[in-house]
């Protein structure tokens, strides 16, 4: 059997990890073992937080819609239910945007929801 030398492979692997660890402090950016741990943990956080961001934004949109709907005398749950009854298919992201940037249009949607109930 021919002996396999792993120098180039190891160097490339280490270089890839140390490149990802750029900007970390102390040994976490210079030493392979520490950098590898830090990078793996960072990638786990990144994966988790990509999913959490979706939940956080939905929560924010709901809070904004609720606040705007209550200014028009209607709670969030009745507003959403009324929109569904009226057949209005506007997602929460757009509703929150309307509530912030175009309150008059949002008020018209509240009236549509109120009539549908």
UniProtKB/Swiss-Prot annotation:
<dbReference type="GO" id="GO:0019843">
    <property type="term" value="F:rRNA binding"/>
</dbReference>
<dbReference type="GO" id="GO:0006412">
    <property type="term" value="P:translation"/>
</dbReference>
<keyword id="KW-0687">Ribonucleoprotein</keyword>
<keyword id="KW-0694">RNA-binding</keyword>
<dbReference type="GO" id="GO:0003735">
    <property type="term" value="F:structural constituent of ribosome"/>
</dbReference>
<dbReference type="GO" id="GO:0000027">
    <property type="term" value="P:ribosomal large subunit assembly"/>
</dbReference>
<comment type="similarity">
    <text>Belongs to the bacterial ribosomal protein bL20 family.</text>
</comment>
<dbReference type="Pfam" id="PF00453">
    <property type="entry name" value="Ribosomal_L20"/>
</dbReference>
<comment type="function">
    <text>Binds directly to 23S ribosomal RNA and is necessary for the in vitro assembly process of the 50S ribosomal subunit. It is not involved in the protein synthesizing functions of that subunit.</text>
</comment>
<keyword id="KW-0689">Ribosomal protein</keyword>
<dbReference type="InterPro" id="IPR005813">
    <property type="entry name" value="Ribosomal_bL20"/>
</dbReference>
<dbReference type="InterPro" id="IPR049946">
    <property type="entry name" value="RIBOSOMAL_L20_CS"/>
</dbReference>
<dbReference type="GO" id="GO:1990904">
    <property type="term" value="C:ribonucleoprotein complex"/>
</dbReference>
<dbReference type="InterPro" id="IPR035566">
    <property type="entry name" value="Ribosomal_protein_bL20_C"/>
</dbReference>
<protein>
    <recommendedName>
        <fullName>Large ribosomal subunit protein bL20</fullName>
    </recommendedName>
</protein>
<dbReference type="GO" id="GO:0005840">
    <property type="term" value="C:ribosome"/>
</dbReference>
<keyword id="KW-0699">rRNA-binding</keyword>
């Amino acid at each position: 059997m021919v002996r396999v030398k792993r120098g180039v492979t190891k160097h490339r692997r280490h270089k890839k990890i140390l490149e990802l660890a750029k900007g970390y402090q102390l040994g976490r950016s210079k030493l392979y073992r520490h950098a590898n741990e830090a990078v793996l943990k960072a990638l786990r956080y990144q994966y988790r937080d990509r999913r959490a961001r979706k939940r956080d934004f939905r929560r924010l949109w709901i809070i904004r819609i609720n606040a705007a709907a209550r200014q028009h005398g209607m709670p969030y749950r009745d507003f959403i239910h009324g929109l569904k009854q009226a057949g209005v298919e506007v997602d929460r992201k757009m509703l929150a945007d309307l509530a912030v940037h175009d309150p008059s249009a949002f008020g018209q949607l509240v009236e549509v929801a109120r009539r549908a109930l």
